Amino acid sequence: MRFSTEGFTSKVVAAILAFSRLVSAQPIIFDMRDVSSSADKWKDQSIYQIVTDRFARSDGSTTADCLVSDRKYCGGSYKGIIDKLDYIQGMGFTAIWISPVVEQIPDNTAYGYAYHGYWMKNIDELNTNFGTADELKQLASELHSRSMLLMVDVVYNHYAWNGDGSSVDYSSFTPFNQQSYFHDYCLITNYNDQTNVEDCWEGDTEVSLPDLSTEDNEVIGVFQTWVSDFVQNYSIDGLRIDSAKHVDTASLTKFEDASGVYNLGEVYQGDPTYTCPYQNYMKGVTNYPLYYPVYRFFSDTSATSSELTSMISTLQSSCSDVSLLGNFIENHDQVRFPSVTSDTSLIKNDMAFIILGDGIPIIYYGQEQGLNGGSDPANREALWLSGYNTDSEYYELISKLNQIRNQAIKKDSAYSTYKSSVVSSSDHYIATRKGSDANQLISIFNNLGSNGSQDITVSNTGYSSGDKVIDIISCNSVLAGDSGSLSVSISGGMPQVYAPSSVLSGSGICNQ
């Protein structure tokens, strides 16, 4: 379906391009909505990331073939997502993030088809493989009726071409149908050179990703108009920005301001001194600096906690707002964690850490079913083949973790912005406190493994002697000892999450 049904056409885009030339490429000024208000709303959310083509089909099939190595469209759709919102909400998620929605190159390339949504051809058309404009609007409406939010993945760093960069037919792109809108062809060769990162091209000689000159006011002006209309037409609450570190930084701010909603930028870099400054240009950043130490600690029982505890502190001092970082342990670009370890206790600990740490938790579809695909394309499985089992041990764990996070936010308006502190640690466990006095959660994460056990005492909890606290995972209760300390036993390597009984009152958690 064309966006033209909403009053936004290729002709309008062409007019904008022509007008911007007439005014000497001066930036277009918009009546901006309140991005900060949107960002504040997102701090309290828990996001379920969906690869639209692989989550749920319109026909409801749980047997339809989807061979990931074929890299073909498998039939996932907006209607499929709508029909499975109970499944998502049953895990306590308050938002979803879906794949890019615009028209893709149609070719069967050396890397298959563009089922993932990152090979853009035309921003004036929707990708009809996922459904119609009305179905996308219905998805937003159904989410909002449940007080849930919609985040859509957006690409504005590049287009895509099936072939070498020297052979690109720019006239096939809409609306940027001339080479002058793009950087000259050169593949990125040095990721330590920011000019090379921003001005050269991602991709390779098989599938080229022509790099837009987003620093050009003509180009970013079109995207400002486009995203403003796009967000309003489809009632979108937030945007995930693909390849953000490859975009001119000033353009990131212009785009977010024009969108009027929270933007979560993909900055694929584990160094916080590189990643954190991107919050000067957009509100949110994917938390790769946290991803790597989390991955290393929870995937290896011989790893020690020092790197992870250090990174918690470093992010708090380096990033302007850790509550707006997007935390994850799996996504469409990374291997699934169960492909690295089959130890269920380690998998549960990393899930708990992601959901209960500083920032916005993002769980990748299929984590709740223990999907174990490795590198792309193996990590983009069809979820329907799992049967959407709500009795899965990971589905039940994620439900509990989201439930306690949502309850903590309900009881304590400062919970999301309260910075976690590591109150106790050793080589193989970390205990954190998050939340204001009388409402704080004490979470204990470990990498002992399913055969591991350890008796520990956690001090500096902020509890008072005699306070009753409950581990929401096991539902076992403990009385705080002298000075509020907790003496507990880690058994079977399981994480523990303690909350005061007063916080749980009326929640239904552990029958409270």
Curated annotation (Swiss-Prot):
Does the UniProt entry include the keyword Signal?
yes
Q: What's the record's note on cofactor binding?
A: Binds 2 calcium ions per subunit. Calcium is inhibitory at high concentrations.
Q: Give the enzyme's EC designation.
A: 3.2.1.1
State the disulfide connectivity. Answer: C66-C74, C186-C200, C276-C319, C475-C510
Question: Which residues make up the binding site for Ca(2+) 1?
Answer: N157, E198, D211, H246
Q: What influences the activity of this protein, per its activity regulation comment? A: Alpha-amylase expression underlies catabolite repression by glucose.
Q: What is its main location?
A: secreted
Q: Which Pfam families does this UniProt record tie to the protein?
A: A_amylase_dom_C, Alpha-amylase
GO cellular component annotations, sorted alphabetically? extracellular region
Kindly state which keywords UniProt assigns to this record, in alphabetical order.
Calcium, Carbohydrate metabolism, Disulfide bond, Glycoprotein, Glycosidase, Hydrolase, Metal-binding, Secreted, Signal
Q: Which residues form the active site?
A: D242, E266
Name of the protein in its database record: Alpha-amylase 1
